Amino acid sequence: MIGGLFIYNHKGEVLISRVYRDDIGRNAVDAFRVNVIHARQQVRSPVTNIARTSFFHVKRSNIWLAAVTKQNVNAAMVFEFLYKMCDVMAAYFGKISEENIKNNFVLIYELLDEILDFGYPQNSETGALKTFITQQGIKSQHQTKEEQSQITSQVTGQIGWRREGIKYRRNELFLDVLESVNLLMSPQGQVLSAHVSGRVVMKSYLSGMPECKFGMNDKIVIEKQGKGTADETSKSGKQSIAIDDCTFHQCVRLSKFDSERSISFIPPDGEFELMRYRTTKDIILPFRVIPLVREVGRTKLEVKVVIKSNFKPSLLAQKIEVRIPTPLNTSGVQVICMKGKAKYKASENAIVWKIKRMAGMKESQISAEIELLPTNDKKKWARPPISMNFEVPFAPSGLKVRYLKVFEPKLNYSDHDVIKWVRYIGRSGIYETRC
């Protein structure tokens, strides 16, 4: 499994070093520094093989985390551990920086002792770790038998992600459906590729050990090898959603999801990611971009771009930004826009059009005259795609929360006693239209 873990600063100096296997020597530290951190060319691959040794590395600000092994390991598992390690450190001392790591090096070694056992990842849940590793990294020597039994049951039992005895004056549950819609469209309006990457993030401030049940669209189709029935609708008339793949937090009971398409779980305390999913079928495209580019001789271009919002009139899109590329030999630009503000940025070779808000089923347009410098280059302008950024208050995949129920039999509070909030946020990923 993992033979060693090293944490470096931007100079390549080792801040944290822990070796778990005898086959990892001191030369591994120097090899990573020379071949990755101080490499003449930027290393783009997150996995680097040097002398039959594999280095799995991630970077946070100016800090490098590198897991080293000489064995054939599961790469996804190693990266999951590295990202979890970053989350745990951030939960304990905030920003991952050289100063914070030096100030908390004792705490980090304690965390590594609990998270990795002879190179095998064990317990990386922040809630469980904070039960027996304090903020200062000093373990309490005066624990009662009851406290010790709680720690043991949490670490080794079925519910390692939540400790017992949590109490809140007001029980609250916040659920965010966060989606990123990606699109590539032809100038004629044909969708060349489109997909949505989504996350369901929950903030749980509930007392005791509550049972939560979360239901989505009446019918969810989990696609397998590209086959499915995405266009089916349930008997109640509500549209189904076809999910290509999804992953869940370890607290979710998968047997319930397979049989009922509902998500049952005992949530961790605080913020966590309940599920992550991806879909490519029946996507609601929030905006359509209609470009028109006309060449007037060799020294002038006329550009007209229309954007149309494709959602309910009662909803408002925000933070809208359209980037219209211009040729490298542009000498001047005159812009007229119906709404918002537009500006030519010579350093980026683009016209940037910003609109604060736009309601659904509306359209707006921008016109520009682009003056070009004479050039001897016979190669025609490649016409890069027009890109767009935005934020909308709905899920482009069509995912909807039907219900969110909470039960806590021991403390005798019911679903009606819990304050619940559900929010949908759809953002643009790579949203481009060719022109």
From Swiss-Prot:
Record Pfam families: Adap_comp_sub (PF00928), Clat_adaptor_s (PF01217)
InterPro entries: Adaptor_comp_med_subunit, AP2_Mu_C_sf, AP2_Mu_N, AP_mu_sigma_su, Clathrin_mu, Clathrin_mu_CS, Longin-like_dom_sf, MHD
Keywords of the record: Cell membrane, Coated pit, Endocytosis, Lipid-binding, Membrane, Phosphoprotein, Protein transport, Transport
Name of this chain's protein: AP-2 complex subunit mu
CDD domains assigned to the protein according to its UniProt record, in alphabetical order: AP-2_Mu2_Cterm, AP2_Mu_N
Phosphoserine modified-residue sites: 45
Domain MHD: 170-434
Membrane topology term: Peripheral membrane protein
Tissue: Detected in brain.
GO biological process, one term: receptor internalization
Function, in words: Component of the adaptor protein complex 2 (AP-2). Adaptor protein complexes function in protein transport via transport vesicles in different membrane traffic pathways. Adaptor protein complexes are vesicle coat components and appear to be involved in cargo selection and vesicle formation. AP-2 is involved in clathrin-dependent endocytosis in which cargo proteins are incorporated into vesicles surrounded by clathrin (clathrin-coated vesicles, CCVs) which are destined for fusion with the early endosome.
GO molecular function: clathrin adaptor activity; disordered domain specific binding; lipid binding; low-density lipoprotein particle receptor binding; signal sequence binding; transmembrane transporter binding
Cell compartments where the protein resides: Cell membrane; Membrane, Coated pit
Binding site for a 1,2-diacyl-sn-glycero-3-phospho-(1D-myo-inositol-3,4,5-trisphosphate): 341, 345, 354
Positions of post-translational Phosphothreonine modification: 156
GO cellular component, one term: clathrin-coated pit
Entry's family note: Belongs to the adaptor complexes medium subunit family.
Posttranslational mods: Phosphorylation at Thr-156 increases the affinity of the AP-2 complex for cargo membrane proteins during the initial stages of endocytosis.
